[in-house]
Regions:
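Single conserved hydrophobic/aromatic residue that forms the stacking wall/gate
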Residues: 1-13
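Short, flexible turn/loop "capping" segments at secondary-structure junctions
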Residues: 5, 49-50, 109, 191-196
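Beta-strand scaffold of nucleotide-dependent catalytic cores
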Residues: 15, 22-43, 47-52, 72, ...
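A short catalytic or substrate-binding loop motif that flags glycine-/basic-rich loops and adjacent residues
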Residues: 17-20, 81-83, 193
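Bateman (tandem CBS) regulatory domains
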Residues: 51-59
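Active-site "cap" helix and flanking loop/linker of ATP-utilizing ligase/carboxylase catalytic domains
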Residues: 64-89, 95, 104-164
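A short, glycine/Asx- and small/polar-enriched loop/turn
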Residues: 93-99, 192-196
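Peripheral (often C-terminal) accessory segments that flank ATP-dependent C-N-forming ligase machineries
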Residues: 128-227
Length: 227
């Protein structure tokens, strides 16, 4: 332990700054075979914190680009020796091709695998993960090809006094869920990480474009009062 701490003080790892559109690849590995379930487009707050503010499935990019992104993810998963279970691989599409940001041997957060994947493909990755852990064969066959999206809600910083329009947003056909991570009376700081996000809207459409449009309609209905 002493040696490890000394090494930390004497060196650092420097990563190349990557510019380009951001994606995540949702995969499930079974007996060494990596199955790509979905490719997700990511929307962030931009510099300096790049907080994830939305996800959309399927990706809007052409099939050949999605294939390249998927192959890079699969190569990274293979290199790490992940043979069983889920992986969530974040990728940037740079001017020199897809580059891996990170690989997590886990299901994707931000409602990606709990909500968006089943809404866009019909594949229940949570159930599949449990079945793999039990030594059973998971069902990874896509049932349909629809659009799904989530957009996070973020008012200006201040004290969260009230919110209106939630019932109207929930009443829009195609809106699956409107939820909140913060309670009335909480202090909402300036957005710097995912824990600062206040709420979210999840939608499903026959296409990704429809899902995005429905998200936009629902978000416009929701009005925050901050003091």
């Amino acid at each position: 332990l002493h040696t490890a701490y000394r090494r930390q003080r004497q060196m650092c790892i420097r990563d190349r700054y990557m510019e380009g559109d951001e994606f995540s690849v949702e995969t499930m590995s079974v007996d060494g075979v990596c199955h790509v379930i979905q490719v997700t487009d990511k929307l962030t707050s931009g510099a300096p914190y790049f907080v994830e503010m939305g996800h959309t499935q399927p990706s809007m990019f052409a099939e050949d680009i999605k294939m390249r992104i998927s192959e890079v993810a699969k190569a990274g998963i293979k290199a790490l020796g992940i043979n069983h279970g889920p992986s969530h691989t974040e990728i940037k599409l740079t001017s020199t091709g897809p580059k891996i940001v990170e690989i997590g041997a886990r299901l994707g957060g931000g409602c990606i695998t709990t909500h968006l994947v089943p809404l866009s493909t019909g594949v229940n990755m949570v159930e599949a993960n449990i079945r793999i852990a039990l030594g059973e064969t998971p069902d990874l066959c896509k049932k349909y090809d629809k659009g799904a999206a989530i957009r996070f809600l973020q008012p200006l910083p201040g004290i969260f006094k009230s919110v209106e329009g939630v019932d109207e947003a929930r009443g829009i056909s195609g809106v699956i869920e409107v939820g909140f991570m913060k309670k009335i009376g909480e202090v909402i700081p300036e957005l710097s990480n995912g824990l600062d996000r206040v709420g979210y809207v999840i939608t499903q459409g026959n296409t990704r474009e429809e899902a995005v449009r429905l998200c936009g309609q629902a978000v416009k209905k929701i009005k925050f009062e901050m003091v």
